[in-house]
């Protein structure tokens, strides 16, 4: 039991840092989805595009 506790005490960083990265990527993706939904309703981007005109957001 002491060995398991020692391993957890020594290597907690190796678990929390990747978990933080994964959670950050997930939250970033959700934020992008919300901003995309707003962009499609925005008055700025509501106009029709000219022929051969690219979208202004990427």
Curated annotation (Swiss-Prot):
Keywords attached to this entry: Electron transport, Membrane, Mitochondrion, Mitochondrion inner membrane, Respiratory chain, Transmembrane, Transmembrane helix, Transport
Membrane topology: Single-pass membrane protein
Disulfide bond positions: none
Source domain of life: Eukaryota
Keyword Mitochondrion: yes
Predominant place of localization: mitochondrion
GO cellular component annotations of the record: mitochondrial inner membrane; respiratory chain complex I
Binding partners and assembly: Complex I is composed of 45 different subunits.
Function comment: Accessory subunit of the mitochondrial membrane respiratory chain NADH dehydrogenase (Complex I) that is believed not to be involved in catalysis. Complex I functions in the transfer of electrons from NADH to the respiratory chain. The immediate electron acceptor for the enzyme is believed to be ubiquinone.
Protein name as catalogued: NADH dehydrogenase [ubiquinone] 1 beta subcomplex subunit 1
Organism: Pongo pygmaeus
Gene designation: NDUFB1
């Amino acid at each position: 039991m002491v060995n398991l506790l020692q391993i957890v005490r020594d290597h907690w960083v190796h678990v929390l840092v990747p978990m933080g990265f994964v959670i950050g990527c997930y939250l970033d993706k959700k934020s992008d989805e919300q901003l995309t939904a707003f962009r499609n309703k925005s008055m700025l981007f509501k106009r029709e595009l000219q022929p051969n005109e690219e979208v202004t957001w990427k």
